[in-house]
């Protein structure tokens, strides 16, 4: 078995990891181009990742608060007929389905409302599945999330973007 994961999302650092038996790990170290042509994580980054893992293992309140915020924001987006993909993660994909429009909406949200919402376009996703990646955190409050929904509504109107919710969260 091989277990792999990222340190860049929930742990707030960079890099990733694999866990397996010695034979598999040695084979990956010797043959994987992504490993051969990279460098080790700086000690500060490795320690930050270790500290994040230790903290999250023993403190569930931030995870619980983030899950509550994700549920709240998904429900608000659906109430406003904003199409999101159904999933079980903390990332809420707001479907735009057009790369140029996705970039324009993202830029408009930042320039006019101060919301940095990452556009996700091809080749990360298939053409026609372009989306905005919304990630509520544990320190967002309801007012912030409602402001985001309002900003999305206004931006969609400005760009004459028709939104239809096809998935329940």
Regions found by a protein language model. Name each.
Residues 120-121:
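Cytosolic Rossmann-like ligand/nucleotide-binding regulatory domains
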Residues 9-10, 84-86, 126-129:
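Short, flexible turn/loop "capping" segments at secondary-structure junctions
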Residues 50-112, 116:
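Conserved PLP-dependent catalytic core of the aminotransferase class-I/II
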Residues 2-4, 11-60:
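Conserved core segment of the aminotransferase class I/II
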Residues 19, 93-95, 135-137:
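Short hydrophobic/aromatic beta-strand micro-patches
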Residues 111-112, 124-169:
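PLP-dependent enzyme catalytic core of the Aspartate aminotransferase-like
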Residues 9-11, 45, 96-98, 124, ...:
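Glycine-rich beta-alpha junction loops
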């Amino acid at each position: 078995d091989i277990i792999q994961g990222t340190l860049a999302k929930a742990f707030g650092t960079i890099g990733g990891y694999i866990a397996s038996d010695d034979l598999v790990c040695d084979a990956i170290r010797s043959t994987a181009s992504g490993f051969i042509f990279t460098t080790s994580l700086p000690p500060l980054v490795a320690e930050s990742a270790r500290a994040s893992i230790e903290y999250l293992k023993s403190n569930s309140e931030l995870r619980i608060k983030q899950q509550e915020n994700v549920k709240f924001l998904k429900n608000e987006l659906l109430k406003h007929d904003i199409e999101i993909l159904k999933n079980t993660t903390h990332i809420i994909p707001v479907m735009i389905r057009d790369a140029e429009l996705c970039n324009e909406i993202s830029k408009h949200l930042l320039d006019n409302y101060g919301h940095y919402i990452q556009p996700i376009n091809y080749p990360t996703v298939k053409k026609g599945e372009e989306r905005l990646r919304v990630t509520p955190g544990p320190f967002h409050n309801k007012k912030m999330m409602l402001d985001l929904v309002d900003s999305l509504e206004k931006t969609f109107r400005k760009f004459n973007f028709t939104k239809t919710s096809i998935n329940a969260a």
